[in-house]
Curated annotation (Swiss-Prot):
Residues 27-130 form the CoV 3a-like viroporin TM domain. It is found in: Host membrane. It is a multi-pass membrane protein. Its main location: host cell. Signal peptide: none annotated. GO terms for cellular component: host cell membrane; membrane. InterPro entries: a/bCoV_VIROPORIN_3A-like_CD, a/bCoV_VIROPORIN_3A-like_TM, MERS-CoV-like_ORF5. Disulfide bonds: none annotated. It comes from Bat coronavirus HKU4 (BtCoV). This is Non-structural protein 3d. Keywords: Host membrane, Membrane, Transmembrane, Transmembrane helix. The keyword Transmembrane helix applies. The lineage of its organism: Viruses, Riboviria, Orthornavirae, Pisuviricota, Pisoniviricetes.
Length: 227
């Protein structure tokens, strides 16, 4: 039986080609680890990033520091998603990569438009740092103060002596209020003072929406006032 020497010639097979099948066009280009990621990997990245962004919106911290941390995480995740999407679209031609990029860009455009609109209404860049969507703006002629609110209620309590607790973000210290405005994503209302009350030597003023109709007023005054 005759044997040909060609049967014993060695053939070099690159690891990338063995574990990562490539098309004829891709074979002419240098191997890239991104080409070896299956489409399921892109789908998992898209779903995971979408869920993370939704969880950030559902999570509603009560403190100012918690909202700042939430904003930092949101912008960091958005930047990561943008870089990941662009990187995948440039190095691959998968439909899911383009879908991820479109999702992130759309999300960023809508969020930026919403924050710009709120910033213009509030007259401050605070909406870009604090992700809440309800604010109280107080003007005294010379200066103004913007306070983010955890709730969408119109009620606002002014307390001259009680220290500001960041958990509430309702207390502002001034004795010459000229205008008090409640601003949210959907409405803007002028608040007027209706009554004063004293608790433990601390004088407070209750503000409610300006209205021609009767406004229900319920005041509970514990040692620490919460609205």
């Amino acid at each position: 039986m005759a044997f040909s020497a060609s049967l014993f010639r060695t053939k070099t097979v690159h690891t990338e080609d063995a574990f990562c099948p490539r098309s004829a066009i891709q074979a002419e280009q240098p191997p890239n680890i991104i080409d070896c990621i299956p489409v399921a990997g892109y789908e998992a990245a898209l779903i995971t990033n979408a869920l993370f962004l939704l969880v950030l919106f559902v999570f509603n911290p009560l403190t100012c520091k918690g909202n700042w941390i939430k904003a930092i995480l949101f912008y960091s995740l958005l930047l990561y998603n943008m870089i990941l999407a662009i990187f995948l679209v440039v190095d691959t031609q998968h439909f899911v990569s383009a879908l991820l990029l479109a999702y992130v860009v759309t999300f960023l455009v809508l969020w930026t438009a919403d924050r710009i609109r709120l910033s213009c209404a509030v007259g401050s860049v605070l909406p870009f740092v604090d992700m809440r969507s309800s604010y109280i703006r107080v003007d005294n002629g010379n200066s103004s103060v913007v306070v983010p609110m955890n709730h969408t209620k119109h009620w606002f309590i002014r307390n001259f002596e009680q220290s500001c607790h960041c958990e509430n973000c309702f207390y502002i210290h001034s004795s010459s209020y000229v205008e008090c405005t409640f601003i949210s994503r959907l409405k803007k209302s002028i608040l007027v003072s209706v009554c004063d009350f004293s608790l433990g030597g601390n004088v407070s003023t209750v503000f409610v929406p300006s209205s021609d109709k009767t406004v229900p007023l319920h005041i509970i005054a514990p040692s620490k006032l919460y609205v």
